[in-house]
Amino acid sequence: MVLFLIIAAIIIGLLLWKWLDVRSTDELTSMVKLLGSGNGQHVLSNAFQVDEKSKRHGGELVASVLKAHDVEEIFVLCGGHISPILVAAEKLGIKIVDTRHEVTAVFAADAVARLRQSIGVAAVTAGPGLTNTITAVKNAQMAESPLLLIGGAAPTLLKGRGALQDIDQMVLFRPLCKYVARVERLRDIVPTVREAIKAAKSGCPGPVFVEFPVDVLYPYELVVKEIGFNPNAKGFIQRALNFYLRCHVSRQFGNAWAPQTITPLPTNIPMPKSEKIQEIVQLVKSAKRPVLLIGSQATLPPVKPADLVKAVEALGCPVFLGGMARGLLGKDHPLQMRQVRRDALKDADLTILAGTVCDFRLSYGRTLSKKSKIVALNRNSSQLTKNEKAFWNSDVSVQADVATSLVQVANALGANHTTTPTEWVKSLREKDDEKESANAKKMEQKLTNGFLNPLNFLRTLDQSLPDDAILVADGGDFVGSAAYIVRPRGPLQWLDPGAFGTLGVGGGFALGAKTVYPKRPVYIIWGDGSCGYSLMEYDTFARHKLPVIGIVGNDACWTQIAREQVPMFQSSVAVDLARTRYDNVAKSLGSWGETIDESNADSARKILDEALAVCRSGEQSALVNVLIGKTDFREGSISV
């Protein structure tokens, strides 16, 4: 019997140890002292080390971790679930940028992550606030952007009981995020947020999601007031319920304000192995017609863009840039080709896929020559080998940081490396120039429908761009044409959605870019279809004094879809729009606006310069509504 009682006592003790979440003997000693302190607190508060008089709240803990991780802004759409985080963050000097749609907040955080090469943060309220972000989170996942999404949630005791905006949010975000977590105790806030940020930035970057029930964020006094204690409890059941509620809230706030480390955890970035680097070096040395395709992953830290440029120049290969890598080599670098990628890939004897993926953008690998040696570099194993064996085969595959790999290859080649034969570079340059000349002729064509030639206007836009401009691409046909004509001036000066092909990124990306670089002009290149998704954010630009320049290619049509649908089905159903005065919409939201049509086409450059001057003044955003006509420039361009 005695043995049984001893065993039972041990089991009960272990259960209490677990339930109280005792993490050390020092904590246990502290609990025992509090139990006998007679400090006027409830016995369970003492057992769990709760400070009943504290006015602090969980939002302060969240904000302190973000501040320690050098987060400078949080993009939000307000909601009662997350108010403590926003108030606490602002008190710590973190800028709170509130938007007109939750999806914009996440797109803005995505842009910050790309441009600052760190974590971007968005916070939204529970339920529909979170479901509104799903497209942007998926876009960030496919674009490999490290961002933290903070979401509110119903009180812990009301989960699954029909509370306002209570849904299973975790199940929605698990497929989209590298890391998801729900915090139910204040002492877990700090380690959870630190771990989430580490996960977002480690390996192949991506979005992470942390859910905070409302009672984890508000002060103890308010939570106790709202939890539902019965002050006149009579009988066993009512008293037992009170005891349970007291246990719950005491455990929730237990040891909440104990000192914790809030600084960043070390991130894990895959690095190339030396033997793989040597294999690539040998292929480069023997190649006569190498081609280098650089994608967005090459812009990720730790390598700085300037060091990557030096490595690319040392390799000496003709280069094609895509995604965030556009602009890496500036406007007119002799190694960069723009128009003849298919021809180059067909004739190449070495193709280096530096963060470039064999998806629809490379015809799933079918555009790669069967005679070419192929090197694939990517942090993501699935992207590294996408469609391999089906349409292409790699000779060297390296799952590692792309820019680090290129820098190490360049260093291993050394200063005595004989660069690519000039005949190969010269032949591609001649073909590229021929294509540019053909495009220039199309720019000079007068359209018979009375509207501007979009190619001619885009050339004017390109000529008007200052060297510090950041370009945001959000659209289909008009933006697709711009990608061939408008040239970003430097690294990290081009933002597009990435592989997901998402429409609607414009307002959010521009907001994020302008927040990071408030003194630089940010241009949104919009189609008239895509501008409808985020045009209301001109209100956000005005309220936060973050002026941007919007360029709308207005042909009153979802033209990228119409190009295939109309000739194939002889129907324009759902593709027609109106020649809407989007500039007047911007004006009504406190911005400057102008329309360019056939009557003032000769003043296009002057109007663009005026838009830039308005933006540079810091007083207003600008929107130029350009009434364009149809061309055959992008016939057959649809991707499936």
From Swiss-Prot:
Its cofactor is Mg(2+); thiamine diphosphate. One of its GO terms (cellular component) is acetolactate synthase complex. Its main location: endoplasmic reticulum. One of its GO terms (biological process) is fatty acid alpha-oxidation. It catalyses: 2-hydroxyoctadecanoyl-CoA = heptadecanal + formyl-CoA; (2R)-hydroxyhexadecanoyl-CoA = pentadecanal + formyl-CoA. Mg(2+) binds at D528, N554. GO terms for molecular function: acetolactate synthase activity; flavin adenine dinucleotide binding; lyase activity; magnesium ion binding; thiamine pyrophosphate binding. Residues 477-557 are annotated as: Thiamine pyrophosphate binding. It is found in: Endoplasmic reticulum membrane. It is a single-pass membrane protein. Binds 1 Mg(2+) ion per subunit. Binds 1 thiamine pyrophosphate per subunit. The keyword Lipid metabolism applies. Its EC number is 4.1.2.-. Keywords: Endoplasmic reticulum, Fatty acid metabolism, Lipid metabolism, Lyase, Magnesium, Membrane, Metal-binding, Thiamine pyrophosphate, Transmembrane, Transmembrane helix. Pfam families: TPP_enzyme_C (PF02775), TPP_enzyme_M (PF00205), TPP_enzyme_N (PF02776). Thiamine diphosphate binds at E102. PROSITE patterns: TPP_ENZYMES. The chain crosses the membrane at residues 2-22. Endoplasmic reticulum 2-OH acyl-CoA lyase involved in the cleavage (C1 removal) reaction in the fatty acid alpha-oxydation in a thiamine pyrophosphate (TPP)-dependent manner. PANTHER family: 2-HYDROXYACYL-COA LYASE 2, THIAMINE PYROPHOSPHATE ENZYMES. This is 2-hydroxyacyl-CoA lyase 2. It comes from Caenorhabditis elegans. The lineage of its organism: Eukaryota, Metazoa, Ecdysozoa, Nematoda, Chromadorea.
